[in-house]
Amino acid sequence: VGSEMCIRDRFISFDMEREIGKDILQVEGLTKTVDGVKVLDHVSFTVGRNDKIAFVGDNEIAVTTLFKILMGEEEPDEGFIKWGSTASVSYFPQDNSAFFNGCKLSILDWIRQYSKDETETYLRGFLGRMLFSGDDIFKNVDVLSGGEKVRCMFSRMMLFQSNVLILDRPTNHLDLESITAVNNGLSDFKGNVLFASHDYEIVQTVANRIIEIADKGCYDRQGTYEEYVLSLIHISEPTRRV
């Protein structure tokens, strides 16, 4: 099978159940200490319609902590967040172990618990996009490989049809064809995306805004990652990695 066929077979498409309004997210003065280290220090930004924001910086824990606060999984020490009334959010965590460890459900029954439509035909449609077909869907999720678990998480995310996607390094454990499918799906998505990734191509292709979580506050620039790096060079600041 040629690479083009492999890329086509892995089909990721994020649809929205409803359009998003003008006011999406306000983040004001977020401060958070983790294990004695201040990872967020008065971080403030707002998210507008059509924003696809890549969060970058040297401290991965800072971005993961920010995403957990946005999802209500952690509380900030200071500051607040306010989601718009029309925002519906799906979250792809960096650590998905809580979804699978000790779970004795089949892939089909695992995805069924997140769906309004529980029919096998409907659910097979979402699983099939991530190459779960035939008897694959009856495999227990607790024995899946890292890549298979990531594919399950993407099936779940597509199922929700949210208008805001938050993804924390979603391409870990994926092969090149699957990464390309993720890139295409996020690029084509009509809603908002807040994400972090080690994959340069996804950051460069998907993001139209870059927010770097700094030691104090954050740096916020419109444009691609390449434009962001060039702006840092222009003002003689050290180039920061994704």
Language model region names:
Residues 17-236, 240:
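ABC ATP-binding cassette signature C-motif
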Residues 4, 8-18:
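Short, flexible cytosolic linker that couples an ABC transmembrane/permease module to its adjacent nucleotide-binding
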Residues 1-7, 233-242:
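Single conserved hydrophobic/aromatic residue that forms the stacking wall/gate
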